[in-house]
Swiss-Prot record:
Protein family according to the UniProt entry: Belongs to the PPR family. P subfamily.
CDD domains linked to this entry: PIN_PRORP
GO biological process, one term: tRNA 5'-leader removal
Domain PRORP: 291-525
InterPro entries (UniProt xref): MRPP3_PIN_dom, PRORP_C, TPR-like_helical_dom_sf
A GO cellular component annotation in the UniProt record: mitochondrial ribonuclease P complex
Quaternary context: Catalytic component of mitochondrial ribonuclease P, a complex composed of rswl/MRPP1, scu/MRPP2 and mldr/MRPP3.
Protein name stated in the entry: Mitochondrial ribonuclease P catalytic subunit
Species of the source: Drosophila melanogaster (Fruit fly)
Mutant phenotype after disruption: RNAi-mediated knockdown is pupal lethal, with the majority of pupae undergoing pupation but then most fail to enclose into adults. Larvae also display reduced levels of ATP. Conditional RNAi-mediated knockdown in different tissues, produce various phenotypes that result from adherent, dysfunctional mitochondria. RNAi-mediated knockdown in skeletal muscle is pupal lethal; pupation rates are normal but pupae fail to enclose. Also reduces sarcomere size, and affects myofibril organization and structure. Cardiac-specific RNAi-mediated knockdown results in adult wing defects.
Residues reported to bind Mg(2+) 1: D355, D424
Length: 544
């Protein structure tokens, strides 16, 4: 056991904070319930590692030192802070020891503390099977939280869901109403969705329809599922090969529909699955050569271009769903929109539509008006030298920029200046779409909100059109030359070419993937074969 003198050396007390823990005190104050990473790691390594329990006196000293030593830690949140430090899968006994300590001194653990304890149970569940006693403890905590609060806040709902999915039987399905409860005040988190979808795939009798519904809800809300969901499905298919072709096809189509990159963990599991059932699946890692040629199967990836019918639908819906949306008129007027549409009818079609302000400020905002105007003129010259017809969109204040540079723009391009308060993007996209399917546009803006407002059916069509037609400025050299990023003409998400799927993957999962059109470095080349022998039930070790 640690003695109290050693504990006082490890933990700062009021007026005598440990020098190492005082580092970076000027930085942003941590949120309640958390500790800065360096101090958290020291507390974990110096005190909690390899310990399964602490004495009451030790817990008292830990608690007092944290409350006295940190302004953001108080008697209300200190318990959650401590359980946040004891959160590793092998620290369940230590976390339970602290909760028992609280109860022994007559303190009732609050919802945040019990929620943190449920997350530790869940971490242990992903490392080893939980005992019946541990599962009973989880259910008791969940029942007590729900009995005390008719409506749980979103954080408590998420914690209870993580507890319920760590149990066997049907109790995990009690998490579904909690997911609906979260929707009352917020969008359910990636963690809550993923926990339930993973469980739906991995239970003895899979709830596949439910799992896919949850995945669709997540992706539609721009919340990419965690790796564990895909791994649960792949582990299931390793044991039930009869379902592999249909379910794997659903997975690949899902990744394509929502332009999701899986992580390397999932890619490795797909390769392992392929080696387990070579009669059904052939998977290789690959990379792309010039013009999107797969270096494994030698096929070219599918062109990103959309069909004439898809372009027609996109053009017709854009005006209604984006250009005349209420928040556009908050930054513009119906009169200005009408004036712009009349201008486009008179001067279109264009080969390229340029966002003048976006170009001007793309190499930095601390430029003189003369430098800003000169950069816009340089981009116009880039396209005029290719004999392109150009439209430049800007704001009224650009009239005050360098007369020489703006004169060049005016003489070599159509120029439309909106009110200084207007949004440029809707005007830019309208003019580009109105000019036809061959017209490009020049902007660094990723157009996320516009894609979102087009809806789930048109969003992927818009994204493909955007990828094919968007140019942007990379930089301007010291000699004044510009380096332009040209569009990638092949698809960048999972898709099928003939009998082969090409699936991009990234190094690790991120809940906030970029929307940029960068070519992924890593790909899988997957061929699903027609089944020629009866499916067998393969005995494999399931990875949680």
């Amino acid at each position: 056991m640690y003695n109290l003198r050693l504990l006082r050396n490890l933990l700062p007390i009021a007026g005598h904070a440990h020098p190492r823990w005082l580092a970076s005190q000027h930085k942003r104050r941590p949120q309640p319930g958390s500790l800065p990473a360096d101090r958290l790691d020291q507390l974990r390594s110096d005190l909690f590692e390899r310990r399964h329990e602490l004495s009451g006196a030790e817990w008292t000293e830990v608690r007092r030192s944290l409350v006295d030593g940190y302004k953001h830690i108080n008697g209300h949140n200190v318990d959650a802070v401590i359980l946040g430090v004891c959160s590793a899968p092998n620290q369940l006994s230590l976390a339970k020891s602290y909760v028992e300590f609280l109860r022994s001194r007559g303190s009732k653990p609050n919802a945040a503390t019990l929620g943190r304890l449920l997350r530790v149970y869940n971490a242990a569940y992903h490392e080893r099977p939980l005992s019946e006693a541990e599962q009973s403890e989880i259910l008791q905590i969940c029942r007590s939280l729900q009995a005390e609060h008719e409506t749980l806040d979103a954080s408590s709902c998420e914690n209870v869901i993580h507890g319920l999915v760590a149990t066997s039987g049907d109790d995990w399905q009690r998490g579904l109403p909690l997911l609906e409860m979260m929707k009352v005040t917020s969008t359910p988190s990636v963690a809550a969705y993923s926990a339930l979808a993973e469980k739906a795939f991995s239970v003895a009798t899979p709830e596949q329809e439910l799992a896919w519904r949850l995945l669709e809800e997540m992706a539609t809300a721009r919340k990419p599922p965690k790796c564990e969901v895909y791994l649960a499905l792949l582990n299931r298919l390793a044991n039930e090969t009869a379902q592999l072709p249909a379910q794997l096809s659903l997975l690949l189509q899902f990744l394509e529909r929502h332009e999701i990159l899986v992580s390397q963990r999932v890619a490795i599991r797909l390769q392992e699955l392929s080696s387990q059932v070579p009669q059904l699946l052939h998977t290789r890692t690959t990379h792309l050569g010039g013009l999107g040629k797969c270096q494994s199967c030698q096929q070219h990836l599918q062109p990103v271009a959309i069909s004439d019918e898809e372009f027609r639908q996109l053009s017709e819906c854009f005006l209604e769903r984006v250009l005349i949306r209420r928040d556009v008129f908050q930054r513009s007027t119906p009169e200005e929109v009408a004036r712009f549409k009349k201008f486009v009818e008179k001067t279109a079609p264009y080969d390229c539509v340029i966002d003048g302000l976006n170009v001007a400020y793309s190499t930095g905002t601390k430029k003189t008006p003369q430098q800003l105007a000169k950069l816009v003129a340089t981009v116009v010259r880039h396209f005029r030298e290719q004999d392109k017809r150009v439209l430049v969109l800007g704001r009224e204040h650009m009239r005050n920029w360098s007369k020489q540079a703006m004169h060049y723009v005016h003489c070599n391009a159509s120029l439309f200046l909106t009110s200084n308060l207007s949004h440029d993007d809707p005007f830019l996209l309208y003019a580009t779409l109105r000019s036809g399917q061959e017209t490009d546009f020049f902007s660094r803006d990723l157009m996320r909100s516009h894609a979102f407002h087009l809806g789930t059916e048109l969003k992927p069509i818009f994204r493909r059109w955007q990828q094919e037609h968007q140019f942007s400025l990379v930089t301007q050299t010291q000699t004044g030359q510009i380096i332009v990023k040209e569009p990638v003409r092949h698809r960048l998400c999972a898709h099928q070419v003939a009998d082969t799927w090409h699936v991009p993957y990234c190094a690790q999962y991120t809940p906030h993937p970029t929307d940029s059109f960068e070519v992924p470095a890593n790909w899988l080349c997957i061929q699903m074969k027609e089944q020629t022998i009866p499916a067998t039930k393969t005995k494999t070790k399931t990875t949680r």
